[in-house]
């Protein structure tokens, strides 16, 4: 029984500017399958190797798999669908499987537009995939698909079937990833010129922000034993020569006690590896006295979800942090030798040239080491997407990549929005390149920042940054001719829209019922009041009792 996993060849000009990122999903899935007795698992990274369709076809033909599996975030969905179609063209008997967050919630539409997909794994994939592979191995899968929990498929009569959800894996430490399945020499983090990994510290989130779907996908918040996470990192460092890692969690500092234990264990092991995280301003302020410990443990890069600059916008997005809190959190990190990156969301409905300029001025005032302006992108399966309703005009999911303006502001067209964002980038990083980075006193921070600048300049020179080459942007003189090439024929079909708008009784999460957002009379912006946040919104904290409860479930 041979299982072939393929990472689809999708590129967007976003996170890739820092290097090639190892697809951790395949290591966790392969490790779980091998522990379950299925050891013939092969991986092809079509994205990192930039494989053409013909090359993918050749790989499948040569490897002769029984099952081909792909994963897909929203912008990669069409590439994943095409990859699985190629597998069926090579051999119609191959069982084709799609996983990932997009298929989990958009399965009615995916199965309609890609009928060659035999099954979609919904949510956490390890146990579902093991059950599916077992059914295929026993020759009963196609006849008994309804007996495999956690999948969706199209029945012979065309009806879309979603089986009951598979319970989340309570003890994540049962999963031993097979990191050896990856070609590590190809996953280089450009700022440090070292191999990079993305291990899990926890899965899920205890909070239910409307712009996010992590809590909905994982269904339960579970955190790992910090010592076992460090065991995994030690394997990555000593066996695979990894020199930098980023925790995959949206916010690993949620569980304060466990995060402290994680840092203490890293210090104890003295692995000499640097790492980065995403987190919230409120967590940094909460942990002010712990920042020296974090830095001693190797934490070198923190990306903060500050999102919006003008206080008006902070209020509009229901962000319970203030401008001064953002500024203070950034300074605290810098004072402790930690590189800071501020994340801003742009392109809201009320965006203007003036608010974009305010964003730039605020970035200069806060003075983070780096700034990132991401386009406002409502995931089609998020609560936010439903709240926006007919304000969403673009359904070409390949462009849902945070660098393409999906939403059009009322006061400007998309080309001008892109141009002004590029102006912010140019001015911000020119100042850093000539007046700040080379003169940073901390040697390790200076080396890291100059490496980040190298990655930024490299992607700009190659026209890969922000997909500039593909859309035809060459500066302000081209803002009127930029072509985002939206496929206007793509829509959300009625069945998918119905599935998204109703509660799925078979998809139960740990979270209590959410409070429905209602439009305030006369307030045209209220429906997007929770919209413009990457992770970093709000001030919620886990209480000591809640932290203890997660530990009990994991034990």
From Swiss-Prot:
<dbReference type="GO" id="GO:0031419">
    <property type="term" value="F:cobalamin binding"/>
</dbReference>
<dbReference type="InterPro" id="IPR006638">
    <property type="entry name" value="Elp3/MiaA/NifB-like_rSAM"/>
</dbReference>
<keyword id="KW-0170">Cobalt</keyword>
<dbReference type="InterPro" id="IPR034466">
    <property type="entry name" value="Methyltransferase_Class_B"/>
</dbReference>
<keyword id="KW-0479">Metal-binding</keyword>
<feature type="domain" description="B12-binding">
    <location>
        <begin position="9"/>
        <end position="143"/>
    </location>
</feature>
<dbReference type="InterPro" id="IPR007197">
    <property type="entry name" value="rSAM"/>
</dbReference>
<dbReference type="GO" id="GO:0016491">
    <property type="term" value="F:oxidoreductase activity"/>
</dbReference>
<dbReference type="InterPro" id="IPR051198">
    <property type="entry name" value="Tetrapyrrole_Bchl_Biosynth_MTs"/>
</dbReference>
<dbReference type="GO" id="GO:0005829">
    <property type="term" value="C:cytosol"/>
</dbReference>
<keyword id="KW-0949">S-adenosyl-L-methionine</keyword>
<feature type="binding site">
    <location>
        <position position="205"/>
    </location>
    <ligand>
        <name>[4Fe-4S] cluster</name>
    </ligand>
</feature>
<feature type="domain" description="Radical SAM core">
    <location>
        <begin position="191"/>
        <end position="416"/>
    </location>
</feature>
<dbReference type="GO" id="GO:0015979">
    <property type="term" value="P:photosynthesis"/>
</dbReference>
<comment type="function">
    <text>Involved in the tetrapyrrole biosynthetic pathways leading to chlorophyll and bacteriochlorophyll (BChl). Catalyzes the anaerobic formation of the isocyclic ring (E-ring) in Mg-protoporphyrin monomethyl ester (MPE) to yield protochlorophyllide a (PChlide a) via a six-electron oxidation and the formation of an oxo group at position C13 using oxygen from a water molecule.</text>
</comment>
<dbReference type="GO" id="GO:0046872">
    <property type="term" value="F:metal ion binding"/>
</dbReference>
<comment type="similarity">
    <text>Belongs to the BchE family.</text>
</comment>
<keyword id="KW-0411">Iron-sulfur</keyword>
<keyword id="KW-0077">Bacteriochlorophyll biosynthesis</keyword>
<protein>
    <recommendedName>
        <fullName>Anaerobic magnesium-protoporphyrin IX monomethyl ester cyclase</fullName>
        <ecNumber>1.21.98.3</ecNumber>
    </recommendedName>
</protein>
<dbReference type="Pfam" id="PF04055">
    <property type="entry name" value="Radical_SAM"/>
</dbReference>
<dbReference type="GO" id="GO:0051539">
    <property type="term" value="F:4 iron, 4 sulfur cluster binding"/>
</dbReference>
<feature type="binding site">
    <location>
        <position position="212"/>
    </location>
    <ligand>
        <name>[4Fe-4S] cluster</name>
    </ligand>
</feature>
<keyword id="KW-0004">4Fe-4S</keyword>
<dbReference type="InterPro" id="IPR006158">
    <property type="entry name" value="Cobalamin-bd"/>
</dbReference>
<feature type="binding site">
    <location>
        <position position="209"/>
    </location>
    <ligand>
        <name>[4Fe-4S] cluster</name>
    </ligand>
</feature>
<dbReference type="GO" id="GO:0036070">
    <property type="term" value="P:light-independent bacteriochlorophyll biosynthetic process"/>
</dbReference>
<keyword id="KW-0149">Chlorophyll biosynthesis</keyword>
<keyword id="KW-0846">Cobalamin</keyword>
<keyword id="KW-0560">Oxidoreductase</keyword>
<comment type="pathway">
    <text>Porphyrin-containing compound metabolism; bacteriochlorophyll biosynthesis (light-independent).</text>
</comment>
<dbReference type="Pfam" id="PF02310">
    <property type="entry name" value="B12-binding"/>
</dbReference>
<keyword id="KW-0408">Iron</keyword>
<dbReference type="InterPro" id="IPR023404">
    <property type="entry name" value="rSAM_horseshoe"/>
</dbReference>
<keyword id="KW-0602">Photosynthesis</keyword>
């Amino acid at each position: 029984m041979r299982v072939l996993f393929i990472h689809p060849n999708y590129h967007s000009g976003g996170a890739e500017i820092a290097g090639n990122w190892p697809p951790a999903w395949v290591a966790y899935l392969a490790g779980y399958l091998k522990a379950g007795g299925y050891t013939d698992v092969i991986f092809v990274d079509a994205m990192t190797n930039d494989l053409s369709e013909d090359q993918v076809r050749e790989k499948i033909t040569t490897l002769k798999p029984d099952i081909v599996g792909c994963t897909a975030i929203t912008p990669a969905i069409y590439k994943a669908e095409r990859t699985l179609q190629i597998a069926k063209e090579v051999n119609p008997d191959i069982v084709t499987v799609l996983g990932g967050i997009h298929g989990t919630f958009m399965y009615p539409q995916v199965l309609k537009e890609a009928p060659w997909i035999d099954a979609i794994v919904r949510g956490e994939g390890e146990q579902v995939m093991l059950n599916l592979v077992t059914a295929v191995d026993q020759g009963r899968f196609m006849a008994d698909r309804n007996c495999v929990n956690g999948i969706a498929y199209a029945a012979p009569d065309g009806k879309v079937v979603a089986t009951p959800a598979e319970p989340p894996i309570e003890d994540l430490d049962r999963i031993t990833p097979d990191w050896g399945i990856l070609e590590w020499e190809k996953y280089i983090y450009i700022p440090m010129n070292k191999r990079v990994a993305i291990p899990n510290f926890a899965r899920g989130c205890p909070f239910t922000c409307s712009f996010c779907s992590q809590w909905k996908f994982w269904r339960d918040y579970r955190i790992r034993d910090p010592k076992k996470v460090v065991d995994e990192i030690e394997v990555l460092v000593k066996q695979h020569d990894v020199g930098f890692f980023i925790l995959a969690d949206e916010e690993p500092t949620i569980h304060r006690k466990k995060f402290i234990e994680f840092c203490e264990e890293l210090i104890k092991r003295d692995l000499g590896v640097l790492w980065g995280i995403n987190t919230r301003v409120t967590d940094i302020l909460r942990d002010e006295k712990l920042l020296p410990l974090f830095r001693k443990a190797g934490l070198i890069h923190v990306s903060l979800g500050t999102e919006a600059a003008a206080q008006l916008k902070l209020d509009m997005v229901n962000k319970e942090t203030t401008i001064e809190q953002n500024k203070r959190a950034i300074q605290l990190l810098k004072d402790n030798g930690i590189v800071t990156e501020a994340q801003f969301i742009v392109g809201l409905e009320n965006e203007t040239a003036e608010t974009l300029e305010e964003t730039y001025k605020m970035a200069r005032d806060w003075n983070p080491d780096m700034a990132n302006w991401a386009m406002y992108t409502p995931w089609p399966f998020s609560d936010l997407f439903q709240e926006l309703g007919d304000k969403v005009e673009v359904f070409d999911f390949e462009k849902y990549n945070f660098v393409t303006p999906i939403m059009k502001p009322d006061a400007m067209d998309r080309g001008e929005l892109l141009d002004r964002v590029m102006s912010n980038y140019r001015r911000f990083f020119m100042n850093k390149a000539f007046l700040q980075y080379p003169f940073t006193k901390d040697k390790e921070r200076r080396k890291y920042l100059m490496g980040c600048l190298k990655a930024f300049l490299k992607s700009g020179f190659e026209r890969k940054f922000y997909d500039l080459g593909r859309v035809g942007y060459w500066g302000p003189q081209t803002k009127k001719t930029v072509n985002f090439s939206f496929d206007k024929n793509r829509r959300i079909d009625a069945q998918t829209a119905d599935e998204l708008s109703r509660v799925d009784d078979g998809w139960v999460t740990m979270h209590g019922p959410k409070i429905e957002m209602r439009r305030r009379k006369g307030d045209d912006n209220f429906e997007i009041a929770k919209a413009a946040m990457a992770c970093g919104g709000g001030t919620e904290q886990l209480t000591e009792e809640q932290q203890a409860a997660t530990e009990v479930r994991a034990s």
